Amino acid sequence: MKSSPFASDCTPLIKLFLQYKLTLALAESCTCGLVAAQLAPTEGISDVLLGSVVTYHALAKQKLLGVSAETIELYSAESQQTTNEMAMGLHRHLPEADVCVAVTGLCGPGPSATPDKPVGTVFVTIFIDKHAHEYRTQFKGDANSMRQQAADFIYQQLTELLTRLQPMVKPEKP
């Protein structure tokens, strides 16, 4: 696994959120709260992070975020469709969040793994400015390594997205 600038320091990312006066909410499955935990020590986080919900099991995804049983049955709990519903459900429950991030994936063997979706497949949805940005990626290593890679991937995508969309997001107030 290559070294990441994010695992130990999320300051540049949080500075972007602060600069644009944006808030963040997370729905984490395969990362088990790691994304929020690594953001927590960052200066300014209390002005950015509204909360994080860990919805590891399909039942939690359904009960806490409103993911439909049909989506899970058709596509599995670890799919882009489920991740999208997680992000949208999070936004429905917490509309004050400017950015909603959801993550699911396979960091270990299980019944959802297939040749088309092997262990290491991770799905991320970032909902911002009424648009869902979907990502599917693949990681290698043990479960903890894959969780860290997924967290780093989320930090990287958020940084790139906020930088790219800066004219669309809330301007800094004087």
Regions found by a protein language model. Name each.
Residues 1-174:
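Short alpha-helical segments enriched in small residues
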